[in-house]
Amino acid sequence: MMLKPEGLKLIDENGRRLDGRKKYELRPIKMKVGVLKNANGSAYIEWGKNKIIAAVYGPREIHPKHLQRPDRAILRVRYNMAPFSVEERKKPGPDRRSIEISKVIRGALEPALILEMFPRTAIDVFIEVLQADAGTRVAGITAASLALADAGIPMRDLVAACSAGKIEGEIVLDLNKEEDNYGEADVPVAIMPIKNDITLLQMDGYLTKEEFIEAVKLAIKGAKAVYQKQREALKEKYLKIAQEVEGSEQ
């Protein structure tokens, strides 16, 4: 959160935000599954101006062997922002923020996976941010969950994520870059919608108890809308496969 430039209004008198959205409106979201041929599973997401690709490899052998778990697979997540993903070109390779977000995403995804089915193996998730525009962790979680499903990893549920926040004293859904920079708070949430479980809940900034509850409820509502888009993306891929199979049989 940064000091807001004088005269900048994040919401106008008609309740419209800088990008024209209403308070409770998501940015445009597009998802595609199975975008990388060499990965076991993959997904691509455009969320506002965010462009993120996720790839899953595994279950596969772990080296060195002392990292193996005899009772379950281990989930390894690497979140990385490409040097060209932000306006000020960043140094290549993982920084402290990327390492922290990798851990956060792993914690959000792990409850959904049935890791006990693959003892002594690893499931590797790579998330590459090609273009960043606020909310990369929730978009990354959403894409990674799709890629895991695409890889055929047994899951209790998909994980869908969204954030809410506070700008100009108002609770709003899905902050964009300016709102994230100059707003008062950001609350990213990840859920397993069918099980109704929260797998990630964070807060950056300050909210009263009432505002926090309102923001969490709004983020959950947003995540449920994201979940429907995840389902559509998976259906689209497998309907296409079914059509190809039918076509080859004729």
Curated annotation (Swiss-Prot):
GO MF terms on file? 3'-5'-RNA exonuclease activity; RNA binding
Gene Ontology terms: biological process: gene expression; rRNA catabolic process
Subcellular location as annotated: Cytoplasm
Write down the InterPro entries for this protein, in alphabetical order.
ExoRNase_PH_dom1, ExoRNase_PH_dom2, ExoRNase_PH_dom2_sf, PNPase/RNase_PH_dom_sf, Ribosomal_Su5_D2-typ_SF, RNase_PH, Rrp41
* Subunit note: Component of the archaeal exosome complex. Forms a hexameric ring-like arrangement composed of 3 Rrp41-Rrp42 heterodimers. The hexameric ring associates with a trimer of Rrp4 and/or Csl4 subunits.
Q: Which family does it belong to?
A: Belongs to the RNase PH family. Rrp41 subfamily.
Mind telling me what this protein is named? Answer: Exosome complex component Rrp41
Q: Can you name the source organism?
A: Pyrococcus furiosus (strain ATCC 43587 / DSM 3638 / JCM 8422 / Vc1)
